[in-house]
């Protein structure tokens, strides 16, 4: 059985790998010249199942108003006049209740924990190396109010059986010695010892190499134009003016997924959350982080690779704008100087931006659609790296009609009440328009 995977980020590549392991004949198509060249290229590098949380949370609407007035705010909104932007933000606001937050976080943690287990198994089986570490994640709180607010997340961790440790200032210095000199500006921390780190782009490249050995074909530099459909089946995909056919189709185009699905009558509430990162060469390893640090105040992660520090985070709701905002670089540099002033050489840092495909409830869209041979693996937001292996394996099981190792409840697009609307055949814009 032939499967055509659209998109070669970490999600599409993981989908292809796990499908090939189950014996499918897989082809991956992407407009870029190689895998992981867009959102997967320079993300924060953290694999943090326990910190899998939706942006839509109680109190966020009021915080967002306050953040609009702050220079180093973790969230910024640039209104584009796009109706989809307004609809997505309205849906996000509806998810900012305590009850919906709990449901959404449980779904995210469920998939993230499974994904971490899949990654562990993959690493044990293949020895894949991607500058990975298994030294946990430490979430830093600068105020006592932040420490107190972590109680709701701890309750979900306990419910899900995720190990954690609350740290005082001395405890922070114990697990992250380079923070000993600045511990007085911190109120405490929450540490998840089972979390991991690694270079997502390097991982995806090596996973693609392993997929090639399983017979997966990668076709780069090709324009994915539209899906051809009739009734409840996909007939093929128009790629560079030619109709390509398969038995099953997987859409893993990140933020560009809705453009492909809209002509089919499928409304996928996926919208780009623009994020930024700095990659900083390490000059003093003893003054750099040992693993991943999350700064709760600025929503920024600082991650240790072998000889580099990756600083990533923030979110701009600004459509498909990929311009580099110098104020965001200023914020990232400020945080590094605040916590690790002697760890790396900021003058040699590389600055990057990417569009994370976010859903309004934070949970990705993984699973079947109203079309019998079309499957989705998209909408992972800031957690594509964390959820990649689990999402790919889950999707492969669903396509193979095998019982997944975790519950898929609440993960597919049907949770939005997404009944297919009548759509005109073949009328769509290129899925990769910018």
From Swiss-Prot:
An individual GO BP term: D-alanine catabolic process
Pfam families per record: DAO
Known catalytic reactions: a D-alpha-amino acid + A + H2O = a 2-oxocarboxylate + AH2 + NH4(+)
Gene Ontology CC terms, in alphabetical order: cytoplasm; plasma membrane
Residues at which FAD binds: 3-17
GO MF term set: D-amino-acid dehydrogenase activity
EC number: 1.4.99.-
Required cofactor(s): FAD
Pathway terms, separated by semicolons: Amino-acid degradation; D-alanine degradation; NH(3) and pyruvate from D-alanine: step 1/1
EC class name: oxidoreductase
UniProt keywords, alphabetically: FAD, Flavoprotein, Oxidoreductase
Gene3D superfamilies attached to this UniProt entry: D-Amino Acid Oxidase, subunit A, domain 2 (3.30.9.10), FAD/NAD(P)-binding domain (3.50.50.60)
NCBIfam families in the cross-refs: PRK00711.1
Function, in words: Oxidative deamination of D-amino acids.
Family: Belongs to the DadA oxidoreductase family.
Protein name (database record): D-amino acid dehydrogenase
Species the sequence originates in: Pseudomonas putida (strain GB-1)
Lineage: Bacteria, Pseudomonadati, Pseudomonadota, Gammaproteobacteria, Pseudomonadales
Encoding gene, per UniProt annotation: dadA
């Amino acid at each position: 059985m032939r499967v055509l995977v659209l998109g070669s980020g970490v999600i599409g590549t993981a989908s292809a790998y796990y499908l090939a392991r189950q014996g499918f004949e897989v082809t991956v198509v992407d407009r870029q010249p190689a895998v992981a060249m867009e959102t997967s290229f320079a993300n924060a590098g953290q694999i943090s199942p326990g910190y899998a949380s939706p942006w839509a949370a109680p109190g966020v609407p009021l915080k967002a108003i306050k953040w609009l007035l702050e220079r180093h705010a973790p969230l910024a909104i640039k209104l584009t006049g796009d109706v989809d932007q307004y609809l997505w933000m309205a849906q996000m606001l509806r998810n900012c209740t305590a009850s919906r937050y709990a449901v959404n976080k449980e779904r995210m943690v469920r998939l993230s924990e499974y994904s971490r287990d899949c990654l562990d198994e993959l690493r044990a089986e293949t020895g894949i190396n991607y500058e990975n570490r298994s030294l946990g994640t430490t979430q830093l709180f600068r105020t006592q109010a932040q420490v107190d607010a972590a109680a709701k997340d701890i309750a979900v961790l306990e419910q899900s059986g995720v190990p954690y440790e609350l740290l005082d200032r001395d405890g922070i210095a114990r697990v992250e010695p380079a923070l000993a000199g600045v511990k007085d500006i911190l109120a405490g921390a929450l540490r998840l010892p089972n979390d991991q780190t690694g270079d997502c782009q390097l991982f995806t490249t090596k996973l693609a190499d392993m997929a090639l050995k399983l017979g997966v074909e990668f076709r780069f530099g090709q324009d994915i134009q539209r899906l051809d459909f009739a009734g409840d089946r996909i007939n093929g995909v128009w790629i560079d003016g030619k109709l390509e056919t398969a038995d099953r189709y997987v859409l893993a185009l990140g933020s560009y997924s809705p453009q492909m699905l809209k002509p089919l009558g499928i409304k996928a509430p996926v919208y780009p959350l623009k994020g930024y990162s700095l990659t900083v060469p390490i000059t003093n390893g003893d003054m750099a982080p040992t693993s991943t640090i999350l700064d709760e105040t600025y929503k920024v992660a600082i991650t240790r690779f072998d000889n580099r520090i990756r600083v990533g985070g923030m979110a701009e709701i600004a459509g498909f704008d990929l311009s580099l905002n110098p104020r965001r670089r200023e914020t990232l540099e400020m945080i590094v100087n605040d916590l690790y002033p002697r760890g790396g050489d900021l003058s040699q840092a590389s600055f990057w931006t990417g569009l994370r495909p976010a859903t309004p409830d934070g949970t990705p869209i993984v699973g079947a659609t109203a079309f019998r041979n079309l499957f989705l693996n998209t909408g992972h937001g800031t957690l594509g790296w964390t959820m990649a292996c689990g999402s790919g394996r889950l999707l492969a099981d669903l396509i193979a009609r095998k019982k997944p190792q975790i519950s898929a409840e609440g993960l597919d697009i049907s949770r939005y009440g997404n009944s297919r609307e009548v759509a005109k055949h073949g009328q769509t814009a290129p899925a990769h328009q910018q």
